[in-house]
Amino acid sequence: MTFILSGFADEISPDLDDQLAILGAESISHLELRSVWSTNVADLSGSQLASFRHALDDAGVRVSAIGSPIGKIELEAPLGPELERMRCVADIASELGTQIVRVFSFFVPPGAPPERHRRQVIDRMFALTEIAEDRGLILAHENEKEIYGDRPERCADLITAVGSPAFRATFDAANFVQCGVQPHTEGYGLLRPYLVYLQVKDALAATGEVVPAGQGDGQVGETLSALRDSGFEGYVSLEPHLGEAGRYGGFSGPQGFRRAAQALKALLDELSISYQ
């Protein structure tokens, strides 16, 4: 089984040429598009998209997924504008030749049990999923801190409640660690039936600090091994967050991204997992 390496190239630099240079240096042939030229993917103009696509074609790089911001808003915010952004992102995904769009399940109001908002979240995710179904896309839900689906049991419940093959899961070990979860022990078994994508960063349980893969408490090696043994073939996407980590993104810089890439490849080699 082969894993395909990818990464959030905006963690390298806002500049596309810089991004492609580092991806090439690390022999990574795909990227996950979250932003470029300091512009979020959902806000890219037609001319920017055309320039982006032509540059990737020239470099021999493809898009593994759209790292969209969809669902990373307050639960009480109006849904209509988010559905419009989802349609825009769907157009971009189709134009760039990828089927996978990362999404989130909304920031829940603090101080109340998240389960109190379950029905509202399900309804919103179902509305987003209907757009994906119409466009032939797969929404990959990321377990993000402070959203409804921040823990494995709520992620799994949400996916089963929506009940569509167009709504699946991506797995972020560091985010689980920062929520007090042992990612592989507590999360992998629940979410493996729905996993279509893996985002790679690790974290220390004691402090929440983000570290390269295999250097924290995220049980990344265990998850990689289990995915291989289960027959997973798909994208393993670096999201290093080694320089900055905020609510809406992160940054590593060229050397930080390379350090994260080399740590992941060393871990895959140690586990005898093939990748390209």
Regions found by a protein language model. Give the residues of each.
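Active-site-proximal loop/turn and secondary-structure-junction residues that shape catalytic pockets
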Residues: E11-S13, S35-W37, P69-K72, S105-P109, ...
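Glycine-rich, proline-tolerant flexible connector loops at the mouths of alpha/beta enzymes
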Residues: E32-R53, F106-A112
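N-terminal small/glycine-rich loop or linker at the start of catalytic domains
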Residues: M1-S6, V63-I73, S105-V108
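Short, solvent-exposed loop/turn segments at secondary-structure boundaries
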Residues: A42-G46, L75-G80, A112-H117, G180-P183, ...
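Conserved beta-strand positions in the central sheet of alpha/beta enzyme cores
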Residues: E32, A65-G67, R102, A140, ...
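Catalytic-core regions built around general acid/base machinery
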Residues: S47-D58, R124-I131, G187, E222-A226
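Active-site acidic/histidine proton-transfer and metal-coordination neighborhood
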Residues: P14-A21, A55-D58, E74-A169, Q178, ...
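Histidine-acidic metal/acid-base catalytic patches
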Residues: M1-A9, S13-S29, D57-G60, P152-F171, ...
